[in-house]
């Protein structure tokens, strides 16, 4: 439900805070209505299964590729997935998940975009720009990924509002 609301607000170009607090200006309700109609027709399938395993994701992905011809999978986020039993630690578990998502993308021949949390190390640096070593719980993510993209929002760490809402993309 939260993800759907975020998507709706992004599509409508409406600040989600206004929707949540009931303070959406009346002139923006039209934008929200148009976006809701557009999204209803969009081929987007949301699955918020908690602690989904790669095996469960693979089965669902195969079915959606066959039945709905989906063209991309987004995992939000990698560290919320459950890895196989019997691994020694969380780093190994994330490594197995990362490798399995890469194999899934090759198997079903569509992109699998996996979002990841960052470690707290990024907050210890002066510039706070994320780096590959900041990917949380595994170095395997950077090895398995075809591309790693970071969003850097300097206004989050600053008192100045001049660039609020803007983000730098680091590839």
Feature annotation, model-predicted:
Residues 92-171:
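Phosphate-binding/switch region of NTP-binding enzymes
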Residues 1-2, 9, 13, 50-53, ...:
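Conserved nucleotide-binding/hydrolysis micro-motifs of P-loop NTPases
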Residues 42-49, 87, 118-126:
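Short, basic, glycine/proline-bearing loop/turn elements
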Residues 1-69, 83:
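Cytosolic-facing regulatory segments adjacent to core modules
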Residues 72:
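Hydrophobic "anchor" residues on beta-strands that sit immediately upstream
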Residues 2, 23-27, 34, 41, ...:
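Charged, alpha-helix-enriched surfaces in structured cytosolic catalytic cores
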Residues 4-15, 78-102, 125-128:
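Conserved P-loop NTPase nucleotide-binding/switch module
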């Amino acid at each position: 439900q939260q993800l759907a609301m975020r998507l709706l607000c992004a599509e409508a170009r409406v600040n989600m805070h206004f929707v949540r607090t009931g303070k959406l200006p009346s002139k923006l309700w039209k934008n929200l209505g148009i976006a809701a109609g557009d999204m209803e027709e969009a081929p987007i399938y949301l699955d918020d299964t908690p602690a989904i395993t790669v095996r469960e994701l693979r089965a669902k992905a195969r079915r959606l590729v066959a039945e709905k011809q989906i063209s991309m999978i987004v995992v939000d986020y990698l560290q919320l997935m459950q890895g196989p039993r019997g691994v020694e630690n969380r780093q190994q578990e994330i490594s197995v998940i990362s490798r399995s998502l890469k194999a899934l993308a090759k198997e079903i021949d569509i992109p699998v975009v996996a979002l990841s949390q960052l470690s707290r190390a990024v907050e210890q640096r002066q510039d706070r720009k994320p780096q590959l070593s900041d990917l949380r719980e595994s170095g395997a993510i950077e090895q398995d990924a075809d591309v790693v993209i970071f969003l850097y929002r300097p206004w989050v760490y600053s008192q100045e509002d001049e660039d609020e809402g803007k983000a730098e993309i680091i590839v």
